[in-house]
Amino acid sequence: MVKRKANHVIPGMNDASAQGKGAGYNEELSNEPLTEAQKQNNKKRKKNQ
């Protein structure tokens, strides 16, 4: 899987990754179950609380 780069790169600057470090994308491929503390703070579940 190719890491996608942002296409708004200014020459001379460091290339910004399209999603930033740790914004899913690589991490979401390995879905480990969340701990209880993470479930409480999960943004997808906040609307359910």
UniProtKB/Swiss-Prot annotation:
UniProt GO cellular component terms: endospore-forming forespore
Keyword Kinase: no
InterPro entries, per database record: SASP_SspO
Compartments where located: Spore core
Signal is among the record's keywords: no
Family classification: Belongs to the SspO family.
Name listed for the protein in its UniProt record: Small, acid-soluble spore protein O
